[in-house]
A protein has these predicted regions:
Chain A
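Conserved ABC transporter NBD signature motif
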Residues: 57-68, 72-73
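ABC transporter nucleotide-binding domain
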Residues: 173-266
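Conserved catalytic motifs of ABC-family nucleotide-binding domains
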Residues: 151
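Catalytic Walker B motif of ABC-type/P-loop ATPase nucleotide-binding domains
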Residues: 155-159
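Conserved ABC ATPase signature
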Residues: 89, 130-137
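Conserved ABC ATPase "signature" region
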Residues: 97, 101, 108-126
């Protein structure tokens, strides 16, 4: 086990930020910590990194207790925090070199690592730029390069794509997968379910400092009763027909907005086929039709009764 | 690791334009302003030769020989212009002479205003008249006694200078300015604490996650700040001495030592405020500027009289104000022949440095935070 946190409790006065949270990260996986803002993701990361005090629990990294002075453990950990933490007075190259130098004293080795990190995040053309000249997306990439240049075995990324343009976001996500392929174990926190779904091999959903579900994305989706969501473009449907549609077996809700009818179903085989048969039997004229599997947001919604992004 | 952190801190701080402005450009600009504003201060108390119009209506060789003595030598008292009475009146009216001495059987003095030069002329003539009258009386009674008399003035006081230096009032302003510049080094101290306390900045949080003892990192980084401040102070001193021609006496080695101590106290003061005061960086910056300016004001940077008022009305404040201790250390070094006052000031500064640095250490040594 690369990372193990047991029974973590962290209180800020009356507020319980972490409520007996336990998690395990295995070697070589991309572990996603998914939860809405304020759910305790960053607090959990700060506890794991021994940055903040916690009231209860214990943390082991690489099988050994984590502590502020556990320097032999820290040298194999790379951290990319939510907020960009670089020096505005240093260029891209100098920033990466400075932070890498805190881990790698040898100048020659470091030079190579810095070059690799800059190439990896796609900032080769910007190495002499100062951070103020970089766009938000490029700045995030620089933040990542500063955290990973020393080639750590465990990389913790805390919402690294907040306020990033889609192009940079994709680049960052691809980079994380590439780092994982190179052998790094990743802990990735986000409130963007699409990102977590896309790159994480195992996911923990947390809310109010508690773990509410854990497993692969398929495991998580199996936990809920909700089946697929079917959307049909119709050209004229009556209230009566909508009511009939809702009364079909395994259909939970039907909503209509303009020409689009959204049908949510419970888990069952052939839901789409049954809906199509109904439309045909009622002679309802229709255009596009598509079906989607439940998302992690649906999982979160069913378990907590609220949207992930609330 | 020392070289890595030290070198990068130098780079970061030297490229920080705001920091360089407040710690180097601002004191130099203020020194230039002081030099323009107080340039004539030192001259107001100096003595100039008194211009006198001499109107000789009757010959008086005895008096003329005395006058010749007063106009000769390296530091003459009078500059005489022998003129006619109407010309003397014109010179007096135009302000070219301080007074008209008319030489006849008895001497007379005419002035058209009161002042130090006119008073000196009056005292001179009074004393001459008094001495000649006394000598005349004695000569009439016993000429032999007069022959044996010593007319050298008897002085009942002895002059013992407290200083080897010449008095220059404007120096006090420059001392307070140098003290202020040292204490503007507190910005460096604040930056260093911000860079090491994970609950104060994101960069500090990142540094705290590195496999590095945070107090070592703090020390290496602070040394870079201290080095820059010392170089800035040396540049300020060079500007004062070489460009503005301010004379700081011949104890330059001790002056530099005092700057080292003052800069140390200044940086530790910044660290103290940054670690003790809760609030954002702007609040702390405001507090540092306010405290330094208040300390400089009480040390006499804006009005020299304030320093004396503090000495008279609240002497304890002299010792509680580190800016004053530093300014006064320079003052003591320049004006006094003994080092007691200087040592008291330096000891006070070191006590402050220890208290500030010690308190900062107690906060900075914390390894985990309640929140970041």
């Amino acid at each position: 086990m690369i990372l193990e946190a047991n029974n973590l409790v962290k209180r800020y006065g009356d507020l319980v930020a972490l409520d007996h949270l336990s998690l395990e990260v295995k070697k070589g996986e991309i572990f996603g910590l998914l939860g809405p803002n304020g759910s305790g993701k960053t607090t959990a990361i700060n506890c794991i990194l021994s940055l903040i005090k916690y009231d209860k629990g214990d943390i082991h990294v690489f099988g050994r207790p984590m502590a502020p002075d556990a320097y032999d453990l820290k040298k194999d950990i790379g951290v990319v925090m939510q907020d960009v933490a670089v020096f505005n007075e240093l260029t891209v190259y100098e920033n990466v070199d400075y932070f890498c130098g805190l881990y790698v004293p040898d100048k020659q080795t470091r030079k190579q690592l810095v070059e690799e990190a800059i190439d990896f995040v796609g900032l080769s053309d910007y190495r002499k730029f100062y951070p103020k000249k970089l766009s938000g997306g490029l700045l995030r990439r620089l933040n990542i390069a500063c955290g990973i240049a020393h080639k750590p075995k465990l990389i913790i990324l805390d919402e690294p794509t907040v306020a990033v343009d889609p192009q940079s976001r994709n680049r960052i996500l691809e980079g994380i997968v590439a780092l994982n392929r190179q052998g790094a174990t990743i802990v990735y926190t986000s409130h963007y379910m699409e990102e977590v779904e896309k790159i994480c091999s195992r996911i923990m959903i947390i809310d109010k400092g508690r773990s509410i579900a854990e497993g692969t994305k398929d495991d998580l989706k199996k936990m809920i009763s909700l089946g697929e969501k079917i959307t049909v473009e119709v050209f004229g449907i009556s209230e009566e027909q909508l009511e009939k549609l809702e009364n079909l077996p395994h259909i939970s809700t039907v909503t209509c907005e303009g020409n689009l009818v959204e049908i949510r179903s419970h888990k069952s085989k052939n839901n789409l086929e049954k809906v199509l048969e109904f439309i045909k039997s009622e002679n309802i004229s229709f255009g596009r039709i598509y079906s989607e599997l439940p998302t992690l947001n649906d999982v979160f919604l069913e378990i907590t009764g609220k949207e992930l992004r609330d | 690791m020392f070289r890595h952190i030290f070198a990068y801190r130098l780079k970061v701080l030297l490229r920080d334009k705001t920091m360089i402005f407040w710690t180097m450009i601002f004191p130099i600009a203020l020194a230039t302003f002081f030099n323009l504003a107080f340039g004539g201060l030192g001259e107001s108390g100096s003595f100039n030769v008194i211009d006198v119009a001499l109107v000789e209506t009757q010959p008086n060789p005895q008096f003329m020989s005395v006058l010749d003595m007063m106009t000769a030598g390296e530091t003459p008292l009078f500059a005489l212009q022998k003129v006619t009475a109407p010309r003397g009146e014109t010179l007096l009216a135009d302000g070219h002479v301080a007074g008209i001495i008319t030489v006849s059987e008895s001497m007379s003095l005419k002035v058209n205003q009161s002042g130090i030069r006119q008073s000196i002329l009056k005292v001179f003539l009074d004393r001459y008249a008094h001495t000649t009258r006394t000598a005349g009386r004695i000569a009439a009674e016993d000429p032999q006694v007069l022959m044996e008399m010593d007319f050298t003035p008897v002085v009942f006081t002895e002059e013992r200078p407290v200083s080897h230096a010449e008095m220059d009032i404007k120096l006090s302003y420059f001392y307070a300015l140098i003290a202020m510049a040292c204490f503007y080094g507190s910005f460096f101290g604040m930056e260093e604490v911000n860079l090491i306390q994970a609950n104060l900045s994101k960069r500090a949080a990142r540094l705290n996650m590195a496999p590095l003892h945070k107090l070592k990192a703090f020390l290496y980084s602070s040394l870079a700040s201290y080095s820059i401040l010392i170089v800035e102070m040396m540049l300020l001193m060079a500007y004062l001495v070489l460009i503005l021609k301010i004379d700081f006496g011949n104890q330059i080695g001790w002056v530099i030592f005092t700057i080292f101590v003052g800069s140390l106290t200044g940086i530790s003061f910044g660290g103290f405020i940054a670690s003790m005061v809760k609030g954002d960086e702007n609040v702390k910056t405001g507090l540092l500027i306010g405290a330094t300016m208040a300390g400089s004001f009480l040390a006499g940077m804006m009005f020299q009289n304030v320093k004396h008022l503090v000495q008279l009305k609240a002497p304890i404040l002299q010792y509680l104000n580190p800016v004053n201790l530093l300014a006064d250390a320079f003052y003591a070094l320049y004006f006094f022949n003994t080092c007691k006052r200087y040592l008291i000031n330096i000891a006070g500064l070191l006590v402050f440095a220890v208290v500030f640095a010690g308190s900062t250490y107690l906060v900075v040594r914390r390894r985990k935070y309640a929140s970041v």
